[in-house]
Structure formats: C-alpha cells, structure tokens
Amino acid sequence: MLETITSVNGVVNGIVWGPVGLALLFGTGFVMSVRTGFFQFGHFRYWLRNTIGAIFTDRDITAHTEKNDKAISQFQSLCTALAATIGTGNIVGVATAILSGGPGAIFWMWAMAILGMMTNYSENVLGIFYRRKNADGEWSGGAMYYLADGLGGKKGCKKLGRVLAVLFACFCVLASFGIGNMSQINSIAGNMNAAFQVPNLLTGILLAVLSALVILGGLKRVAAVTEKIVPLMALFYILGALTVVLTHVTAIPAAFAAIFKGAFAMQAAGGGVLGYGVSRAITWGFKRGAFSNEAGLGSSVMVHASSNVKEPVQQGMWGIFEVFADTIVVCTLTALVILTSGFVDLNTGRMLTEVQGSALVGEAFSTVFGSFGPKFIAVSILLFAYSTVLGWSHYGTKAFEYLFGTKASMGYKVVFVAMVLVGATMKLDLAWDLSDTFNGLMMLPNLIGVLSLSGTVAAITRNYVDRKFHGKQVEPMWSAFAEYQKEEEAEEATLDKAANE
C-alpha cells in the first residue's frame, strides 16, 4: 500500500512540479505582469512607500480593529502571511537549490520571484474583490471564492468554477497538515535535538500546548502573535546572515558572478555537464522560488482577505512586498551566506562539502560564529517553522470552513493541534513528498482562476490608477457584490464627513 502511494505520488508530483506546472506558474506571472503594465517595476517606489514604508507613518496600516470587528490590520495580515511563507524553505530550500542546481539556481529563483510578485498581487486583488462575510461576521476570501464566484460567474463556467473551488479547498486542508504542520514541526524537533539535545517528544508537547493557546483563540489571536514574532525573527536572521556575509565581503563579487555564470550554463551545476547544468539551475530555481514565497499557491490570500482594507489594489501591493521580503531579501541572504563561506567552488559551481540541507547553512554560519552556528540555525528554524504552523492553521481553517461550514472549523483546529505532536515524534519522509504534491495540486486550480480573471485584475488596477494617480472621478471597484460595495461606500462617506467637520 505504501509503495503504491509513493509511486502514485511520484507521478502526480512529476506533473504538477514538472515542466508543465512550472511553465504555467512562470507564464501566469508573466501574463499578470503584462496585463498590469509591469506594476512591480513601474510603481516600485509607490508600492514600497505604501506598504512597509507606511508602517511608521500611517496608523491605518497597523491600528488594531475594535473587539467586535472581525477583521485584522493590514500589518497583521502581512505578518500572518509572512509567518506562513517564511519557513524552512528559506533555509533548507535555498541550500537544496544550490546543491541540486548550482549557484545559477538563485538567478532563476529571483526570476520566478519577480514574476511571482504579480501573481501574488493578483491573488490578493481577487481575494479582496470576491470575499464574503461568514456566519460569524468574519471576512472569508481566497481562491475558493474567486473560483466559485469569479470563474463560476462566467458564461458556461458555473460548474467548473465550483468544482475547482472544492478541489482547491480539499488540497489546501491536506497540505495544511503536511507542509503547514507536521513537516515544519519535524524540522524543529530534529534541529533542536541535534543542537540542544532536547527530546523530540518534549519539543512536540511544548509546541502543541503553545499552538493550542494561539490557534484555538481564532484569527485575531494568531495575528496578534505573528505581528510580534515575524519582525523579531526576520531581524534576528537578517542580522546574523549579514554578519556572515560582511565578514566574507571580499567573496561577494565572486558569489554574484557564480550565480550569473551558472544561470546561463557557463559552468556546470553540481558537477554536471554544461547545458544540462542550466536546465537543472532553471528547474531548481523555479521550484524553490515557488516553495519559498508560495506565489501561485493561493494560500496567503486567505489571510490577506481578512484585512480591514477597502482597496483590492492596496492589499495586492502587500502581496508584492511579501514576495520581495521572502525571496529577494531572506533567500538571497541565505544564498550569499552559503556562497561566500567557502563551501562552493565559485569558479566551477561545484560543492566542496557533502553536508546538506540545514546542516550546510549551519556550517556556513559556523565560519563566523563557531560552534554557535548550528544553534543559530536551530533557533531560526524554530521561529520560522513554528510561525509557518500558525499561518497555515488559518489557511486550513478557511478551506475547511468553505467545505463544511463555520461551526465545523473548531473540530479542524483541534485535529491540527494534535498533529503537532505527531509531527515531532514520527519519521515523515512520505509526508514531505505528499505535502509537496498537495501544494502543486492547490496551484493548478488557483492559476486557472487567476488567468481566467486576469481581465478583472487589470480593470481593478486601471480603476485604482485612474483614481489615485490621475485624479479621475470614477466609481471605485471594491467588491464584486453590490451589498458589500454599498457598505464600503457608506463607511467611506462617513469617514470623509467626519474628516471635514
């Protein structure tokens, strides 16, 4: 039975993460970039200023909503999304990309991220535009909703949209137990045991208790925790990585040269031959880029849709920043730590060590921090992976809610917390492989939805640009549903009146 599951999983994984799936992912990013006028480049300063740049100047970005308001702040939605996105892939995934595809894989990781910015942007725009309020008055949005109401609203596509929405939700629930829970906890337990000799069972018990205290409290409690953890863990890792890279500052030019040479087959990947090397660099760069920032999976939109924002484009810009922070900043720093620490021959791209995964990154940190290097990585993985569990708990909850209703979601949360203990104490090689596949299966219906609604994304973007950049007096496109559009307009009119008094 186990062999059959492994065999079937291998075939499906080869399709969703093979040339077809990766081409669809890359193509969607390119199409959405074209349809939005390459918004990520043309309005770079604008989206940077109105996202991370506004945190200290615009109280609306960080202000907590009132107790009876089920929405969360824009900053909380970013932190919860980044909590789920910045995980072991930013450490282990980058090391795997370099080991398997050579330094050139990093270039293609960047390429995927640059286009992925607009895929993530589009998901968030559609997430806000098609979101609805559930029985508890909480915003519910995500790929399920824009597949069912957006794609399903097109002529002759009603049944297709609903079927794809259900499939997406099912795959999301299954993925949440794997990549969003057990696999992450397993990484934490293994690294804590290796670095600090903490028993796996003890790690599992402690994390299960902490998870119960946070996750069972609902989205607001999850968001309240992630908005504190994410900035601290990012600062902790970035400062540590910068210390290593700047200590080896003379190797930085050679590291970038190796990345560009490897990307275009001017050197072999992992001891391979020229030509074959560039194919591996592209494949591993694309795969690890997708795993790292999750653009195209339709996952983070489920928390972004809960934000107290009216403008779909505003939340879309947070999606751009999310990919930028995850891949362009954090993953690049991990790559430079490895490439500047002497474990890769920068002239040939060949590995000079047989150490792999997080151990490779730990060894790279050890060149500066000595025996504390592996401990630094263990703590980083603890923070990164545990925050991923918190973020994915919300994704799974929303998908389960879509399938079975709001009242059933508490049952899902209880099972999710119980799986933390399972993840800490069991060998999970197959779980990693299965969760990998379920992520890919989430991606396919989501990208079909994004591409089919590309015209809607383009129209919403034009509407925003016309109003904000050109001062045109046109009706805003805030919601696909008249009742929510009127509700938002009435609230905006009240705020304008109060501001003018």
Predicted segment positions?
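N-terminal alpha-helical transmembrane segments of multi-pass membrane transport
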Residues: 1-84, 88, 98-105, 116, ...
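Transmembrane helix-loop junctions in multi-pass membrane proteins
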Residues: 4-5, 35-40, 89-94, 176-189, ...
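Flexible loop linkers connecting adjacent transmembrane helices
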Residues: 38-72, 96-98, 102-106, 110, ...
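Membrane-interface loop-to-helix entry segments
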Residues: 24-49, 164, 168, 185-192, ...
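Helix-loop-helix module between adjacent transmembrane segments
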Residues: 32-33, 112-137, 148-186, 190-214, ...
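Membrane-interface alpha-helices at helix entry/exit sites of multi-pass transporters
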Residues: 62, 67-71, 102-111, 149, ...
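Alpha-helical membrane segments and immediately flanking helix-loop junctions
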Residues: 59-98, 126-129, 135-151, 173, ...
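Extracellular/periplasmic helix-exit of transmembrane alpha-helices
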Residues: 123-136, 242-258, 266, 270-273, ...
